[in-house]
């Protein structure tokens, strides 16, 4: 288990130049690969609903992980309603819209979405939207939860990374810190 003192912080920014993703940290360009992870909530819209979380990470050659951005919302639709003539989103963005937007913004290698029965509509909507936009370069990988309790999966996956100081958050990422 990790503690607050295990949390590493980073200051810098992301850039894409000549077909390569970088984070710029301490004035140095560090080449990285970028990925998205998504844990969509599947419960109904209440004040106690779970959060849907979509996180963009960068990983460098030394396997250091930098959290670039995350979206954390309650009661997010699978996909937002769109104007049929312009394709412009009307109202609230959905999980699919956010994934596709972040995938393009950060030139991600792939996006992983937790694959449980209730999330199958997300995969269907992602495939439909990729087809509509002709964006077949966007790779979305289903991730089976594996039968262990969610808390155990989180701790086993992140504990070693945090305790060895290889996860770097921004100081303003309060939801991830607390």
Please name every model-derived segment:
Residues 60-178:
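Mg2+-dependent endonuclease catalytic cores in nucleic-acid-processing enzymes, primarily RNase H-like
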């Amino acid at each position: 288990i990790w503690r607050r003192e295990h949390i590493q912080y980073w200051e810098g920014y992301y850039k894409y130049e000549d077909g390569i993703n970088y984070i710029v940290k301490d004035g140095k360009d560090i080449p990285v690969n970028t990925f998205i992870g998504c844990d969509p909530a599947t419960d109904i819209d209440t004040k106690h609903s779970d959060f849907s979380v979509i996180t963009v990470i960068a990983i460098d050659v030394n396997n250091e992980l930098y959290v670039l951005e995350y979206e954390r919302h309650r009661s997010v639709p699978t996909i937002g309603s769109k104007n049929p003539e312009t394709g412009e989103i009307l109202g609230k963005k959905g999980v699919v819209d956010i994934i596709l937007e972040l995938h393009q913004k950060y030139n991600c290698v792939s996006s992983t979405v937790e694959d449980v029965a209730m999330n199958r509509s997300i995969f269907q909507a992602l495939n439909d939207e990729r087809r509509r936009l002709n964006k077949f370069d966007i790779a979305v990988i289903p991730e089976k939860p594996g039968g262990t309790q969610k808390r155990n999966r989180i701790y086993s996956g992140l504990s070693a990374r945090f305790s060895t100081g290889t996860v770097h958050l921004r100081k303003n990422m309060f939801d991830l810190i607390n």
